[in-house]
């Protein structure tokens, strides 16, 4: 490993670099950040990597016989740099000085105190606001998938039957880091596909089975525990493992989450989550995300959620008061985890105290029935123990309040007396020497000193010992000052030690309330989500959905689009029907499809919905094929992706599913497209799925299906061009207005004119061809045709139907 230093020189490694190499050998997959005074340094290859990543100047560590590249970051900016490095894909090993330099005998002792990877973070400043999952995937009896959020202790997993279901769950949870079992890491095809779909850090861990259940899941659980224990130094604070069944929630494939922009925008910045997120706490925000990932299927829990939201809708003053108080709360869920792991800082306990001071106000607003645990004894202890604004680190000192610990108070009193000596010394020496500008100062190099300016050098007593000469002043010390200084230092060390002891005692007592804190965080997160959904409902005019056997939406709106533009509401009524929607591009067909799905999704989350009235069935899944999502990098055309998504819909959708299809078949020839679209429409009609099918194929509007309904999006040609009304009306569209939309898009006038001429010619040709076919058929006597004549007749009719070749049409 010494070779990684890329050093030059004949001599042995200096002790500092020997210590660096020894620690670096223990963590070969990590970038070692090695504390040297006020900086974290890297040496050799790691220094070059750090300098490249952060744009730092590369310097060199030089000793008598050895030189190596060096780069570093200041301790005070560690978190900002660490966040950047983690996002770039680095794993970080942080080696801190674990003893004061002045107390070290020789080389300062250093230990790796933190291992930081994207999926195992505990530090609030480095964590995202959403859940921070570490995932593990193993094979066996299905696909074993497990998730762990180290920051909250959430620990869960499932077994999936297909790779597509696995990918859906990964997209739904969006882990920050993934552990892959050896058989997957060695599978080149799988690895390539996985990396293209999920650009997250991939890590290795032993996949030894853990717990009960299917082998694949047990292996995934074991990998999470092994990896997390290594990064956390063996200490974990976990909730009991929970097996979850994705089938217990509304099915939302990856294509649906993408098309509906639930968490990630296709364009712009707004998503369904962003327009709903009026939460005031971090746990509330994470809970809202979880609800959106897992819409409910059972009416009872849904109605219970809606009752709570409605309560806050009706009680505006209560809603406002609760939200105002929630805004002041710390992230109690993550704070409880840091408490249990012994990682809570003085600042954490200060934030906990402020949060606990808010709980009585919340209880007074909401009543005892809300079920918040009584944490007043802990609040009172923290109020008594901690200063008003505790520092981030214990080593900074000054965190325990005066009067809390008698031993600490006595040490502080003695220290004040020691410091007072130097203040008295300044006055005494001024009088004794007659030097009016004499003053006592302090710095870290010389300790306490007496400072005299140039005009009074001749008055300096002989017993003054010079320690530093500056441009216009000199600094001195006295033997008695050194004795007092040593005593002050000794007392400061004792104060630091006692403060740390007291802090650890207080933190240990707070740790005993970690489970109660988690319970409080859970209750408050739910209240936060209910109040947030109510705030959205009141502010934007949402209504409570009603559940039944039909879908009936009056004046429905798109919850995201209406925030950024004036929106035209629309109605929809259907029951196990196939609804065909025709109309020109840009008229709003896709928006209408999406708004219907979003209203259904919101209803099964437990939210009010953007409409004047909404009656909905309980859907078991929402399936979409909306818009082109090319996978050209993966070797798949738009049409191939479209067909794969349609295949999944036809495989999984039931009569209780909501299916949204937009322009199925457009990625191939017109004849093929019509054939495919017709077959898909017939299959979904037969299945009785609630299907909204937007299409330009007018042939579909004439399908003789009993449960088919035609709608169209209104548009009209006016003098200034095509006008879109964005209204969804009964019946099929009269025409597609493709040429008019092309003109609006800015195609050259001569191209538009040529397109109109071709369109008219083709329409005339088609009409003439149909007349010719009809005339020929009426002249036939089928009973007198031989098989050979019938075959020739079919060929003739086909030629008549096709009409003249396109290239015979001249503009």
Swiss-Prot record:
<keyword id="KW-0234">DNA repair</keyword>
<dbReference type="InterPro" id="IPR007860">
    <property type="entry name" value="DNA_mmatch_repair_MutS_con_dom"/>
</dbReference>
<dbReference type="GO" id="GO:0005524">
    <property type="term" value="F:ATP binding"/>
</dbReference>
<dbReference type="InterPro" id="IPR007696">
    <property type="entry name" value="DNA_mismatch_repair_MutS_core"/>
</dbReference>
<dbReference type="GO" id="GO:0003684">
    <property type="term" value="F:damaged DNA binding"/>
</dbReference>
<dbReference type="GO" id="GO:0006298">
    <property type="term" value="P:mismatch repair"/>
</dbReference>
<dbReference type="InterPro" id="IPR036187">
    <property type="entry name" value="DNA_mismatch_repair_MutS_sf"/>
</dbReference>
<comment type="function">
    <text>This protein is involved in the repair of mismatches in DNA. It is possible that it carries out the mismatch recognition step. This protein has a weak ATPase activity.</text>
</comment>
<comment type="similarity">
    <text>Belongs to the DNA mismatch repair MutS family.</text>
</comment>
<dbReference type="InterPro" id="IPR036678">
    <property type="entry name" value="MutS_con_dom_sf"/>
</dbReference>
<dbReference type="Pfam" id="PF05192">
    <property type="entry name" value="MutS_III"/>
</dbReference>
<dbReference type="GO" id="GO:0140664">
    <property type="term" value="F:ATP-dependent DNA damage sensor activity"/>
</dbReference>
<dbReference type="InterPro" id="IPR007861">
    <property type="entry name" value="DNA_mismatch_repair_MutS_clamp"/>
</dbReference>
<keyword id="KW-0238">DNA-binding</keyword>
<keyword id="KW-0067">ATP-binding</keyword>
<dbReference type="Pfam" id="PF05190">
    <property type="entry name" value="MutS_IV"/>
</dbReference>
<dbReference type="Pfam" id="PF00488">
    <property type="entry name" value="MutS_V"/>
</dbReference>
<feature type="binding site">
    <location>
        <begin position="583"/>
        <end position="590"/>
    </location>
    <ligand>
        <name>ATP</name>
    </ligand>
</feature>
<dbReference type="Pfam" id="PF05188">
    <property type="entry name" value="MutS_II"/>
</dbReference>
<dbReference type="InterPro" id="IPR005748">
    <property type="entry name" value="DNA_mismatch_repair_MutS"/>
</dbReference>
<dbReference type="InterPro" id="IPR007695">
    <property type="entry name" value="DNA_mismatch_repair_MutS-lik_N"/>
</dbReference>
<dbReference type="InterPro" id="IPR017261">
    <property type="entry name" value="DNA_mismatch_repair_MutS/MSH"/>
</dbReference>
<dbReference type="Pfam" id="PF01624">
    <property type="entry name" value="MutS_I"/>
</dbReference>
<dbReference type="GO" id="GO:0030983">
    <property type="term" value="F:mismatched DNA binding"/>
</dbReference>
<dbReference type="InterPro" id="IPR027417">
    <property type="entry name" value="P-loop_NTPase"/>
</dbReference>
<dbReference type="InterPro" id="IPR045076">
    <property type="entry name" value="MutS"/>
</dbReference>
<dbReference type="InterPro" id="IPR000432">
    <property type="entry name" value="DNA_mismatch_repair_MutS_C"/>
</dbReference>
<dbReference type="InterPro" id="IPR016151">
    <property type="entry name" value="DNA_mismatch_repair_MutS_N"/>
</dbReference>
<keyword id="KW-0227">DNA damage</keyword>
<protein>
    <recommendedName>
        <fullName>DNA mismatch repair protein MutS</fullName>
    </recommendedName>
</protein>
<keyword id="KW-0547">Nucleotide-binding</keyword>
């Amino acid at each position: 490993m010494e070779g990684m230093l890329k050093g030059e020189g004949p001599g042995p490694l200096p002790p500092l670099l020997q210590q660096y190499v020894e620690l670096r050998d223990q963590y070969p997959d990590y970038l070692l950040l090695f504390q040297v005074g006020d900086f974290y340094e890297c040496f050799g290859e790691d220094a070059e990597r750090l300098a490249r990543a952060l744009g730092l100047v590369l310097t060199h560590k030089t000793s008598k016989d050895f030189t190596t590249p060096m780069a570093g970051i200041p301790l005070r900016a560690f978190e900002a740099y660490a966040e950047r490095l983690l996002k770039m894909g680095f794993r970080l090993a942080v080696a801190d000085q674990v003893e004061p330099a002045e107390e070290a005998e020789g080389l300062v002792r250093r230990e790796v105190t933190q291992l930081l990877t994207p999926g195992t973070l505990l530090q609030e400043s480095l964590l995202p606001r959403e859940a921070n999952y570490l995932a593990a995937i193993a094979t066996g009896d299905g696909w074993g998938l497990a998730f762990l959020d180290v920051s909250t202790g959430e620990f869960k997993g499932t077994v999936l039957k297909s790779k597509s279901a696995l990918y859906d769950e990964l997209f739904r949870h969006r882990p920050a880091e993934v552990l892959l079992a050896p058989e997957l890491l060695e599978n080149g095809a799988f690895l390539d596909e996985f990396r293209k779909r999920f650009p997250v850090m991939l890590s290795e861990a032993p996949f030894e089975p853990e717990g009960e259940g299917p082998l694949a899941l047990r292996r995934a659980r074991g990998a999470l525990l092994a990896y997390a224990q290594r990064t956390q130094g063996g200490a974990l604070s976990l909730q009991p493992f929970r097996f979850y069944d994705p089938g217990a929630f509304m099915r939302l494939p990856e294509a649906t989450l993408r098309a509906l922009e639930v968490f990630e925008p296709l364009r712009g910045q707004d998503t369904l989550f962003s327009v709903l997120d009026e939460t005031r706490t971090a746990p509330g925000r994470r809970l809202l995300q979880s609800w959106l990932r897992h819409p409910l299927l059972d009416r009872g829990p849904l109605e219970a959620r809606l009752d709570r939201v409605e309560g806050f809708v009706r009680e505006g003053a209560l809603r406002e008061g609760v939200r105002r108080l929630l805004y002041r709360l710390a992230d109690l869920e993550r704070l409880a985890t840091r408490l249990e792991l012994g990682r809570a800082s003085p600042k954490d306990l200060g934030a906990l105290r402020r949060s606990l001071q808010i709980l009585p106000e919340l209880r007074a607003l909401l009543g005892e029935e809300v079920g918040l645990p009584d944490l007043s004894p802990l609040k009172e202890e923290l109020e008594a123990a901690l200063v008003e604004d505790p520092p981030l680190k214990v080593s900074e000192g000054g965190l325990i309040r005066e009067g809390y610990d008698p031993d600490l108070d006595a040490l502080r009193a003695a220290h004040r007396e020691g410091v007072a000596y130097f203040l008295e010394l300044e006055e005494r020496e001024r009088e004794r020497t007659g030097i009016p500008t004499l003053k006592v100062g302090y710095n870290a190099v010389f300790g306490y000193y007496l400072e005299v300016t140039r005009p009074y050098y001749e008055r300096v007593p002989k017993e003054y010992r010079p320690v530093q000469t500056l441009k216009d002043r000199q600094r001195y010390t006295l033997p008695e000052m050194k004795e007092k200084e040593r005593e002050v230092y000794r007392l400061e060390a004792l104060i630091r030690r006692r403060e740390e002891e007291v802090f650890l005692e207080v933190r240990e007592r707070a740790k005993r309330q970690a489970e109660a804190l988690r319970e409080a965080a859970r209750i408050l997160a739910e209240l936060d989500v209910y109040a947030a959904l109510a705030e959205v409902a009141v502010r934007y005019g949402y209504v409570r959905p009603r559940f039944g056997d039909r879908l009936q939406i009056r004046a429905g709106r798109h919850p995201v689009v209406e925030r950024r533009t004036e929106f035209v509401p629309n109605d929809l009524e259907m029951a196990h029907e196939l609804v065909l929607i025709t109309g020109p591009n840009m008229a709003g067909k896709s928006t209408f499809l999406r708004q219907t799905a979003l209203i259904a999704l919101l209803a099964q989350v437990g939210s009010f919905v953007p409409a004047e009235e909404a009656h909905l069935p309980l859907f078991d899944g929402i399936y979409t094929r909306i818009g082109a999502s090319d996978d050209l990098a993966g070797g798949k055309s738009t049409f191939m992706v479209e067909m794969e998504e349609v295949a999944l819909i036809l495989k999984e959708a039931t009569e209780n599913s909501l299916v949204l299809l937009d322009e199925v078949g457009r990625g191939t020839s017109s004849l093929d497209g019509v054939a495919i679209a017709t077959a898909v429409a017939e299959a979904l009609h037969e299945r009785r799925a609630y299907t909204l099918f937007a299409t330009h194929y007018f042939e579909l509007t004439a399908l003789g299906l009993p449960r088919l309904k035609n709608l169209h999006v209104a548009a009209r040609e006016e003098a200034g061009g095509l006008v879109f009304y964005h209204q969804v009306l009964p019946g099929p569209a009269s025409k597609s207005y493709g040429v008019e939309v092309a003109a609006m898009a800015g195609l050259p006038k001569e191209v538009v004119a040529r397109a109109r001429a071709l369109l008219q010619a083709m329409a005339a040709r088609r009409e003439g061809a149909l007349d010719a076919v009809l005339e020929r058929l009426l002249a036939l006597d089928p009973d007198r045709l031989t098989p050979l004549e019938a075959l020739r007749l079919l060929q003739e009719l086909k030629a008549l139907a096709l009409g003249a070749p396109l290239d015979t049409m001249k503009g």
